[in-house]
């Protein structure tokens, strides 16, 4: 039996996210044409190549033209895009955006015709800032919906996903029925799902029954009129295909890969500065001669991205502030969106140990203290997913995250999700890919 839920996808528009990194494959317009009519495909996934849209890149335009010609929804990704650049971005045919971090930004996007997806995830928590403005100004909410963007399994278990967003909205003072609209019919209409998202004759009977509109504790769930809990009893387990394993294949590396010898004393180097509760970063700098002392004091960390799909040997090495880890390293093969191996540490030796551990287990999360592995959570499916039962995995996630925080990772920083976004070169202001440190505002590498 199948899961009692409706499952839809938007085809990834940016694989890789930019030409400034290396991913497992390349998704161009020709590939997308082959997949666009597959069951469950609604439209195009978030168009992260903002300069490519604004300045009319030929390949980007082919993708946009394809989905516009079919009348399909096109998801956007426009962090800090304002004014004339926002107008140009929206004019290309993009329908949604989920990157607003303030009410002022969200309001401008609504005025320009975008549907705004209000985000509350693990690393990015923007709902309160946006909905306070919505509530204070009493605006129409028909072009608003909720999203998580990225949420840890453990956070899903402890908080929920969209229900958590509804609860937060009500707690902020939004009328319960208005808040529920964002979670139901608004989302259905934004994505062109006809006769879904409301209780009405002839509409799909996907229902959640609550005992009240404050706590929103589900009493029963129905999918297409069928009790979802009973339907779950008939689910047939699926064994992951063997081809989805063994994907962590970086070229040979050792402790010298992460050595301070790569930094010249007389040069100034860019430093990524993490922000608690955000995936945006700030820029700072440090002189090469000061790096060793800053590492020792915990002011900066070494950070590296190792290409792990094709064994190219590409390694981007840089510096980061604001993580908090003491005497060790953290590494993960979940590194948006090309999912190379990203590692951060207080020493080359610790980073080498962490990266070697992830090659050994073929992907996942790992935490090192000194040069000894403290804990590892294997993600054996493409280095991204686990075949372990959900409850077991939640316990493992909680445990390794708690150990990372106990080793100094700051509150407001998710040890793994926050780190994973440091490799995504389409979110301001400074990132790192397997090709080096990247300024997303200038859309170029920092030499």
Task: Locate the predicted segments by residue.
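Divalent-metal coordination cores built from histidine and acidic residues
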Residues: 1-73, 374-377
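Secondary-structure boundary motif
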Residues: 2, 37, 69, 136-139, ...
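Short beta-strand/turn micro-motifs composed of small residues
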Residues: 11, 78, 307
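Short, basic, glycine/proline-bearing loop/turn elements
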Residues: 16, 46-48, 88, 92, ...
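Sequence-level motif detector for i,i+2 pairs with an aromatic at +2
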Residues: 39, 141, 298-300
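Active-site core of metal-dependent hydrolases
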Residues: 42-183, 188-198, 207, 211-212, ...
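Active-site microenvironment of metallo-dependent hydrolases
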Residues: 157-173, 177-447
């Amino acid at each position: 039996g199948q899961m009692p839920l409706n499952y839809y996808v938007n085809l990834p528009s940016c694989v890789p996210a930019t030409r400034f990194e290396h991913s497992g494959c390349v998704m161009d317009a020709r590939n997308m044409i082959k997949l666009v009519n597959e069951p469950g495909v609604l439209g195009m996934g978030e168009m992260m190549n903002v300069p490519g849209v604004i300045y009319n890149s030929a390949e980007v335009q082919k993708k946009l033209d394809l989905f516009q010609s079919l009348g399909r929804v096109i998801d956007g990704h426009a962090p800090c895009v304002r004014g004339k650049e926002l107008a140009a971005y929206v004019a290309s045919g993009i329908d949604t955006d989920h990157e607003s971090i303030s009410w002022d930004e969200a309001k401008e996007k609504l005025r320009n015709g975008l549907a705004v997806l209000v985000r509350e995830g693990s690393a990015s928590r923007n709902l309160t800032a946006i909905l306070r403005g919505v509530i204070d100004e009493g605006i129409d909410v028909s072009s608003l919906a909720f999203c998580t963007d990225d949420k840890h399994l453990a956070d899903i278990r402890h908080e929920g996903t969209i229900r958590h967003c509804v609860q937060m909205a009500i707690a902020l003072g939004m009328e319960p029925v208005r808040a529920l609209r964002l979670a139901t019919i608004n989302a259905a209409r934004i994505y062109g799902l006809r006769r879904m998202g409301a209780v009405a004759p002839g509409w799909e009977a996907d229902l959640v029954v609550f005992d009240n509109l404050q706590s929103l504790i589900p009493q029963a769930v129905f999918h297409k009129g069928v009790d979802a809990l009973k339907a779950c009893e008939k689910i047939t387990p699926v064994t992951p295909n063997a081809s989805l394993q063994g994907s962590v294949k970086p070229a040979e590396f050792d402790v010298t890969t992460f050595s301070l010898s790569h930094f010249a004393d007389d040069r100034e180097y860019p430093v990524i500065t993490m922000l608690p509760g955000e995936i945006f970063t700030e820029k700072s700098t440090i002189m090469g001669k000061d790096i060793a002392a800053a590492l020792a004091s915990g002011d900066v960390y070494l950070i590296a991205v190792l290409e792990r799909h094709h064994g190219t040997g590409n390694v981007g090495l840089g510096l980061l502030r604001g993580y908090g880890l003491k005497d060790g390293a953290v590494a993960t093969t979940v590194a948006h969106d090309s999912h190379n191996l990203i590692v951060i540490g207080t020493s080359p030796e610790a980073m080498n140990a962490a990266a070697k551990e992830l090659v050994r287990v073929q992907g996942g999360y790992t935490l090192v203290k000194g040069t000894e592995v403290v804990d590892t959570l294997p993600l054996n499916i493409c280095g991204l997913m686990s075949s372990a039962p959900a409850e077991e995995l939640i316990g493992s996630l909680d445990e390794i995250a708690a150990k990372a925080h106990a080793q100094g990772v700051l509150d407001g920083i998710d040890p793994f999700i926050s780190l994973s976004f440091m490799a995504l070169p389409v979110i301001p202001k400074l990132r790192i890919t397997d090709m080096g440190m990247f300024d997303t505002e200038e859309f170029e590498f920092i030499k």
